Amino acid sequence: MAGKVPTPHIGAQYGEVADRVIMAGDPLRAKFMAENFLENPVQYNNVRGMLGYTGTYKGKRVSVQGHGMGIPSIGIYTYELFNFYDVKRIIRCGSAGAFHPDLKLGDVVFGMGSCTDSNYGAQFNLPGTFAPIADFELLRAAANKAEELGIGYKVGNILASDVFYGDDAESWKQWQKMGVLAVEMEATALYMNAARAGKSALCICTISDSLVHGTACSAEERQTSFTNMMKIAFDII
């Protein structure tokens, strides 16, 4: 179902967005990807400062788009892309905080599944609990590409949390006990919107801080230095 464009959040006309989109929470990271990976990028969106560009990468038409922070924000952008712009696949390139002691700053994590403390799924009125998971073909391609490029990675469950500054500073350890690798704030909505629309999605994260070791990347590093996951995303999209 294509239509209802431009939307309140994306200023593009139908056809200006490619059917393959790589997303980032920070719109400046989207701009960085457009300037460093795309040939002949054309900006199609600056509504609310959430930058979007379309260009080509190795002969493929690809768009990059910011989505903001949190499940409600990515929920809006991915819904509109999947349902109004007829996007077929979305890969999120994001940052995450490590729960696993072996994960170091800059390591790459592929979110095979997305746990959450959000009630985003309640809207679907399901008679049970839905398990939001990545598209297997994208996940397999990402792992294979990481092997090919010699990039270290882990695959497993991640947590999409509604809370950045939690009142209980130790609650993450309960997720750690269940083998959850890392925390971010968006993958559940991405995966559920993809499932509902019959489309494909994958969340790739770079570790920007560690709750285990108390280390963190700078804001500048978060914006520009996560190139390994970007290489993977562009090669498999």
Language-model region placement:
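Metabolite-binding pocket within alpha/beta catalytic cores that recognizes anionic/polar moieties
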Residues: 1-140
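Glycine-rich beta-alpha junction loops
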Residues: 27, 97, 159-164, 189, ...
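Expand to "…catalyze enediolate/carbanion chemistry for C-C bond making/breaking, isomerization
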Residues: 83, 167, 196, 204, ...
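Active-site rim beta-loop-alpha module in soluble metabolic enzymes
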Residues: 129-178
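A C-terminal functional module that forms or caps the active site or interfaces directly
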Residues: 169-208
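His/Asp/Glu-rich mid-to-C-terminal helical/loop segments that flank catalytic regions of hydrolases
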Residues: 211-237
